[in-house]
Amino acid sequence: EFSWTGEPANRLYDQRRFEQYTRFKPEIKMKYVYFYDKSQNERLYSLNQGLTDREIMIKLSVAQGLDTNMYLRPEELKQIIDLSSEDNHVVRVLERENGRKVFLRMFRDMWIYPGEAEVTAAIRQLVDDDLPVVGFLTGHGVRNSEKAGDRDYRYFVQERVYRRALINQGFAIKNVNLDDEIPEQVNILVIADMQTALSPGEMES
C-alpha cells in the first residue's frame, strides 16, 4: 500500500513533502529501499491468480517501465529490517547515529503523508526515553485496544494506518492485568466500559 509514493518517478515530490525539515537540517539523508513481499491487497492476488509474489512484481514493474533488479527479495529485506508488523506497507524508518530507529508511517486518508504532528511525535520517540505510556485494563469485558470491533478501540489506539491512533501521536501502549501491580511507567490507565466488578485484590492494585 502507498507504493506509488516511493516510486522513482515520484521521488522529487516525495522529498518536497519534507522540505520544511531538510531546509533547516540539510544533513538529513533519505535512502530509498525497494522490495517485494507478501501483500495484504487481496484484489492484487485475485487479478494475478497462480503467480508468485516475485512474478507479480515482475509483471507490474515491466508494465510501469521499472527495473526489476532494484527490488530486494523478502529474505534480503529481513536482513535490514522486518516490516511484517507494518504489513509490508511503504514506511519511513527514522534512524539516529546511535542506531535508534522509529517508524514514520503513511496513512489511509485523503492526506496520506504524515503531517507536522506525526513527524514531531516520531522525532520525539527518537530522542526521548520518557514517552507517555497509556495502559489499557484487560478482562472484565472492557473494550479491547487490540480488536477492531464496533465496541473496541484498535483504530484510535494502535491501528498503524490511522493517523490519529495513539501510537502515531507519540504514546506507548501497554495492556494492564490487575492480577499484577500496575507498571510504574504507566501514566494513564484506561478502564473502558467495564462489564463486571473488580475483585478486592484488583481494587488494591
Short names for language-model regions:
Residues 1-205:
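Short, surface-exposed patches at the edges or C-terminal ends of soluble domains, predominantly
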